[in-house]
Amino acid sequence: MTTRTEAVKAYLLDLQDRICSALETFETDTRFIEDAWTRPAGGGGRTRVIENGSVIEKGGVNFSHVFGSGLPPSASAHRPELAGRGFEALGVSLVIHPHNPHVPTSHANVRFFIAEKEGEEPVWWFGGGFDLTPYYGNEEDCIHWHRVAEQACAPFGPDVYSRYKAWCDTYFHIKHRNEPRGIGGLFFDDLNEWDFDTCFAFIRAIGDAYIDAYLPIVQRRKAMAYTEQQRQFQEFRRGRYVEFNLVYDRGTLFGLQSGGRTESILMSLPPQVRWSYDWKAEVGSEEARLTDYFLQDRDWLGLTAPKAAV
């Protein structure tokens, strides 16, 4: 393991610790359980899962460090020059599914790949980002989420936020539904346009920003009253989340195709989901407003949160 890889690994392990500790502040008795695992083909990780808390219905914060003699098709398909190289892949990936339909689901991921071949220079890149999936939208939350994202990107260039926001909107699009998974955030991959130290600093900025972006939203919404109808709508929309993760998500496909640990890969799936045949929201309802307003390509930084928002 190179010095660079060691530095990335140390940061990712610390990030996992800090995120778990921050999320546990919302729970009285429930804590993350840790499952350390080893990958027979090389590497391993530590999966941390929290279930049936008072605020978090299910959440997972996973660290993995795996390696192998060749990249799986999901990783090399868009970069064929990497075929036949050995690889190391390190990352922290998390998904939080709250009980309350007024609290959005959040996802974040930061990762590092290095691909090597004898007689050639190593090829490395970073990837990651974070995105938010509300069920009952709130402008204040959307603006806050994107403002934190923009502030994390600002030191690295005036167009970084706008580029990675657009990439996020494109990536988290459910093609067979022709709708986005949520209100976006940041997404990037194959990042090596700067030197290693700058790219690593950027990854740290994004990883650290997740806590600042998500925790205030949870704090504002976790005690809001909700109805059984709203809970059912949350479960219905969770179905979209499952569809995206199992059909399109690059990380899920990479993990499964590279012989990754299935339990850790699928920890992102919500505990309860609902599919209703050809269900449509009532025109003018809160449920309809989610798709008609919030799940639209929007410049959230150009809006001002309504004064009455709670």
UniProtKB/Swiss-Prot annotation:
Keyword Nucleotidyltransferase in record: no
Source taxon at top rank: Bacteria
Its required cofactor(s), as named, are: a divalent metal cation
In terms of SUPFAM superfamilies, this protein maps to: Coproporphyrinogen III oxidase
The UniProt entry annotates the active site at H107 (proton donor)
* Biological processes annotated in GO: protoporphyrinogen IX biosynthetic process
Which keywords, in A-to-Z order, does the entry hold?
Cytoplasm, Heme biosynthesis, Metal-binding, Oxidoreductase, Porphyrin biosynthesis
Q: Do you know which InterPro entries this protein is assigned to?
A: Coprogen_oxidase_aer (IPR001260), Coprogen_oxidase_aer_sf (IPR036406), Coprogen_oxidase_CS (IPR018375)
Query: Where found?
Result: Cytoplasm
GO function terms (MF aspect): coproporphyrinogen oxidase activity; metal ion binding; protein homodimerization activity
Q: Where is this region: Important for dimerization?
A: 241-276
Q: What is its EC number?
A: 1.3.3.3
Residues where a divalent metal cation binds: H97, H107, H146, H176
Biological pathway: Porphyrin-containing compound metabolism; protoporphyrin-IX biosynthesis; protoporphyrinogen-IX from coproporphyrinogen-III (O2 route): step 1/1
- Quote the cellular component terms of the Gene Ontology held in the record: cytoplasm
Q: Where is this site: Important for dimerization?
A: H176
Subunit structure as annotated in this protein's UniProt entry: Homodimer.
Give the family per the record.
Belongs to the aerobic coproporphyrinogen-III oxidase family.
Q: Which PANTHER family match?
A: COPROPORPHYRINOGEN III OXIDASE, MITOCHONDRIAL, OXYGEN-DEPENDENT COPROPORPHYRINOGEN-III OXIDASE, MITOCHONDRIAL
What is the protein name for this chain?
A: Oxygen-dependent coproporphyrinogen-III oxidase
Q: Which organism is it from?
A: Pseudomonas fluorescens (strain SBW25)
Name the encoding gene, please. Answer: hemF
